[in-house]
């Protein structure tokens, strides 16, 4: 499992540290934003075939891998491109959906239990939530059902609602998390112990783990994925 939650805990420590330079804190904040987004992508919390990077698929006729289409092809097809203007338009639509649209009734629950003094536990819950979609949406019929298959049709149509939901959750949680860090900066600086962390993010590269381990992790938290 790619330890996004470990990264978030460590970079939270660095953001509130009084012993780091302004540049180091700035870098830590950038990584914190990055990892909170990353943790909501189901395959960033998955060991199977290095988070799907080793599962070959096609998308709109182009060869790629399962991880990549969840990172890139699916959202870009939905937004119509990868320009900053496309991202801003999507963000505006998601903001409306959260404030007064389809997510308005559930958005408050997304930050329930958020505790920046315990970032590991907080974000582990988010990772577990995202990982559940591996079984229900990413590979609901197992790895063999998607290998070498073009996933830009029916698969995309089923996946896009989860992609959009997870991005909305990530945005709401990121805003709430950063607000909480800012409000509790002095308390956090006293309570959190600063660890030595490689700012390149190399400490958080994924480790290869066999499928049986991935199954055990999912079963331990109550997921029924058996493939």
Question: What does each model-found stretch correspond to?
Answer:
Residues 1-35, 42-227:
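C-terminal accessory segments of proteins
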């Amino acid at each position: 499992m790619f330890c996004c939650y470990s990264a978030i805990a460590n970079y939270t420590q660095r953001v509130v540290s009084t012993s780091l330079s302004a540049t180091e804190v700035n870098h830590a904040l950038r990584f914190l934003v990055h990892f909170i987004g990353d943790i909501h992508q189901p395959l960033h919390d998955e060991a199977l075939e290095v988070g799907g990077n080793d599962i070959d698929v096609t998308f709109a006729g182009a060869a790629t891998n399962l991880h990549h289409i969840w990172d890139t092809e699916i959202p870009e097809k939905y937004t119509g491109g990868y320009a900053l203007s496309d991202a801003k338009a999507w963000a505006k639509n998601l903001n409306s959906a959260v404030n007064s649209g389809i997510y308005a009734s559930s958005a408050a629950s997304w930050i329930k239990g958020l505790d920046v003094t315990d970032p590991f536990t907080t974000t582990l819950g988010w990772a577990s939530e995202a990982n559940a979609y591996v079984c229900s949406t990413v590979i609901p019929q197992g790895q063999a059902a998607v290998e070498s298959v073009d996933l830009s049709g029916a698969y995309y149509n089923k996946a896009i609602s989860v992609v959009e939901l997870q991005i909305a959750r990530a945005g709401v949680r990121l805003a709430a998390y950063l607000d909480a860090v800012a409000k509790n900066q002095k308390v956090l600086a006293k309570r959190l112990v600063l660890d030595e962390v490689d700012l390149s993010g190399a400490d958080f590269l994924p480790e290869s783990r066999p499928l049986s381990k991935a199954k055990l992790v999912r079963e331990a938290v109550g997921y029924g994925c058996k493939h």
